Amino acid sequence: MNELLHLAPNVWPRNTTRDEVGVVCIAGIPLTQLAQEYGTPLFVIDEDDFRSRCRETAAAFGSGANVHYAAKAFLCSEVARWISEEGLCLDVCTGGELAVALHASFPPERITLHGNNKSVSELTAAVKAGVGHIVVDSMTEIERLDAIAGEAGIVQDVLVRLTVGVEAHTHEFISTAHEDQKFGLSVASGAAMAAVRRVFATDHLRLVGLHSHIGSQIFDVDGFELAAHRVIGLLRDVVGEFGPEKTAQIATVDLGGGLGISYLPSDDPPPIAELAAKLGTIVSDESTAVGLPTPKLVVEPGRAIAGPGTITLYEVGTVKDVDVSATAHRRYVSVDGGMSDNIRTALYGAQYDVRLVSRVSDAPPVPARLVGKHCESGDIIVRDTWVPDDIRPGDLVAVAATGAYCYSLSSRYNMVGRPAVVAVHAGNARLVLRRETVDDLLSLEVR
């Protein structure tokens, strides 16, 4: 079998097929048709894939109320509506994400506001909107939020974000629970307990849970187990100091997100149901060990829901061979996007699966690098891959699993506008975010 024709089901959207002439289709729509209608680069979301992962995650964790979709992975009004319709909650971490959610009429009581440096205006907007929870990240924020809630005449439910000293086995930039970093309050140093005491001393904040997030793209539960042990340990200390009656409302342990996905056919993350069962057992066992009732377990998947069901479609431009030794060369395939729509390879060393999707080729594979159009040597989308030897300008290629942290991390580098985003479902396509134009690029100029 020609491996370059294979579309690994653990990597590509669930509704990916090839038509009778070999063109790759998603939800029954040829990618060539989408490129012709909407242009390239183009993000294509398999709506059924996205929604099915929402439902599977909710079922695995007992209820959509226990699953808070991490908006930072990818958010637009359409996605917010899908999340709402599937019964999940929503985590936002800026006033902008909150504004998008509210624009989509997402129920504010199902929104949680995160962030290590929330401004007064962001906290005020969240309180005014009636968000369900705010995760406080510093003593300064506790004071600010207490004053804002007091001015609004409400008592705001909050969680305290903890730093639990866990080194997740992931990239440094997406590991978030070790001590030397910007998020949370350290359990080991006593800062977390000091924050809990301060919340209890306020008039307008109610502590309802403890939060931890150890990182992203995690495939095993070891880090979660240690994090849960330390979160529950702090909860035990809080109950011991303030008594069971006063602490009865602290009924939630939020272990954050970080559930990994397959970017390559060789990746093998655990099924969500298996992971949920293990996490539930961990929290239950840790609670029993210290004599506490088992709290509600909340998780915050973003990548695990948004990542697998989206591809990025590019048109091939320049193709050139570069000698890498006296006897070998690498095929450099330049496309019409790049690091402005996918910075993850440059930022994290991310790896991807890429395929020729506009036709079938029987040409032998050659080693290749998929690169963008930007004036930057690090503008690499797929560092090491294989392409058919006859790949040529005008071909369409697709990169799989780009639904998380691609559009959301996109930029206007080199004044290249952001791509359009199209959702596909049952043979129909609809535009959910239009392509940025030159007029958009000039819209902020004052003269």
Swiss-Prot record:
Give yes or no: UniProt keyword Cytoplasm: no
This enzyme catalyses: meso-2,6-diaminopimelate + H(+) = L-lysine + CO2
Q: Which prosthetic group or cofactor does it need?
A: pyridoxal 5'-phosphate
- Catalytic residues as annotated in Swiss-Prot or TrEMBL: 375
Effect of knocking it out? Strains lacking this gene are lysine auxotrophs. They cannot survive in immunocompromised mice.
Q: Name one GO cellular component term.
A: peptidoglycan-based cell wall
PROSITE patterns to which the protein is assigned, alphabetical: ODR_DC_2_1, ODR_DC_2_2
Q: What InterPro entries does this protein map onto?
A: Ala_racemase/Decarboxylase_C, DAP_deCOOHase_LysA, De-COase2_C, De-COase2_CS, De-COase2_N, De-COase2_pyr-phos_BS, Orn/DAP/Arg_de-COase, PLP-binding_barrel
Q: Which residues bind pyridoxal 5'-phosphate?
A: 258, 300-303, 405
Q: Which residues form the signal peptide?
A: none
Per the record, the domain of life is Bacteria
Q: Which GO terms describe its biological process?
A: lysine biosynthetic process via diaminopimelate
Query: Which sequence positions carry the modification called N6-(pyridoxal phosphate)lysine?
Result: 72
What EC number(s) does its UniProt record assign? Answer: 4.1.1.20
Q: Which family does it belong to?
A: Belongs to the Orn/Lys/Arg decarboxylase class-II family. LysA subfamily.
Other notes: Was identified as a high-confidence drug target.
| Protein name in the entry | Diaminopimelate decarboxylase
